[in-house]
Amino acid sequence: ALACAPAFAGDSLALDPVSIWLGGYYANTEVNVDAKTHDPDVSTGKVQLEEGDDTVGRARLDLLLFGTQGLQFDYYTLSHSSTQTLSAPFSYLGAPFEANTSLRGKFEFAAGTAAYHWWFGDATDAFGVGLGGAYYRAKLKLEGTVALNDQSASGSQKWDEDAVAPLVTIAWRHAFNDSLRFYIEGSGIWKSGGNLSGHLYDGRAGVEWFPWHNVGLAAEYGETRLKLDREGDTYDANLDIKLHGPSLFARFRF
């Protein structure tokens, strides 16, 4: 009977006592901005920052504790810029950008998460669930030609907000052998209230290969969706951000 009992996750080839990921996420980025007045709730226009590819730096650290539990830390940053011609007037934070003029936009986002994990599994498979918290910061700046007193002039508007939110994670890891593994991971952040609210979903699947015992590579494909609501005293902004693409990591395990 003892020979048939499942192993603790800590005995699994799918997990490491210490695991480090350093790399980048080559993401196709789409940013949609919906501006409106705060009271009454009236739309003042929508604009899509031109879609493009961006490299998102990313770092992770996994620590296994007591064989069946662990800590996970994740941090990444995104910077997306575009220049486009407005097809219709667009008012953002009170700045009335004119149609048929150039609009320059820059969106920056950074997120850091920490989660406590519980792992279950056997010699080759590990299933995990985690709870934790996330800190994220978003910046948006728009520059272009605005209409003021029947005259045109250069103008810009920007905001910079941050927030803390709860985090939920799930994961499955499978080891084909000691040097080749497959994994699927997902996480969700939800935040209501405050100047910057919204939610973030992140999912990814990848393969790890260790030609040396402690050093290897990981390649994955991921998709991230952010919906952020920025509430100001007079004007609000809703942002819908979509990222998807491959990632490559240098892997270190101990």
List each model region and its residues.
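Extracellular/periplasm-exposed beta-strand and loop segments of Gram-negative cell-envelope proteins
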Residues: 30-56, 77-110, 136-163, 191-195, ...
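N-terminal signal peptide c-region/cleavage motif recognized by signal peptidases
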Residues: 4-9
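Short glycine/proline- and aromatic-enriched beta-strand/turn motifs that initiate or cap beta-hairpins
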Residues: 10-80, 247, 251-253
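Glycine/small-residue-rich hydrophobic helix-like segments
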Residues: 194-230
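Transmembrane beta-barrel strands of outer-membrane/channel proteins
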Residues: 22-26, 73-77, 129-135, 172, ...
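Repeated loop/turn-to-beta-strand initiation elements of outer-membrane beta-barrel proteins
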Residues: 68-71, 124-127, 178-182, 213-217
